[in-house]
Amino acid sequence: MRPLASALLMMLAFAPLGCKHRQAQSQSAFEKGAPELASTVHLGDPKVADQLVSGFHEIEANAWRWTARQFVVVLRAPAGSGQIGAGLQVHLTVPPVVIEKLGAVTLSASIGDGTLAPETWSKPGDYVYRRDVPASLIRSGSVRLEFQLDKAIPAGSVDQRELGIVVSSIGLALK
């Protein structure tokens, strides 16, 4: 009985060391590299917050975010898009308050030194801003998309935040 008790005691004594070692390895592996970028971000998902560079407000209704007049997102370039290009889709809503306060609003986008055609909406509603992204604008594994509205509701007039449009998702896919 004595050898069994000694063996159990030894196992219990060294068990925490093994656990700490595995935990330290997983922490350092996570710290070494950023999580993989998504090619489509759903703005109701808090896990994509690191890809929303600027101009996005907090999640609302677990599904969407208001934007400011200018907003920036980084997306993973789909495999092969550097050769054949990609399609951009922004699922958005132009709320009635935006049309009431500002009239028609125009959204434009750019990637590096390239611009994508703007689109204007004069009625409230749900829309999809779709654009082809030429392969020449996809130069690496990630794509920084900069969006700009021609106008936004200034902070303090309706809300404490500058309000542009409501976005539920932004994504790149192969053409």
Predicted features, each with a name:
Residues 20, 107-111, 126-131, 169:
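Catalytic cores of nucleotide-enabled group-transfer and carboxylate-activating enzymes in metabolic
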Residues 1-8:
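Bacterial N-terminal signal peptides that target proteins for export
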Residues 100-114:
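Short, surface-exposed beta-strand/strand-loop-strand elements in extracellular ectodomains
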Residues 84-92, 109, 127-129, 138-156:
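Short, well-structured beta-strand segments within conserved domains
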Residues 92-94, 133, 172:
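Hydrophobic beta-strand positions in extracellular immunoglobulin-like domains
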Residues 20-85, 97-100, 153-175:
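Glycan-recognition and processing domains
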Residues 114-138:
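Extracellular carbohydrate recognition and processing domains
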Residues 15-18:
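C-terminal motif of bacterial Sec signal peptides marking the signal peptidase cleavage site
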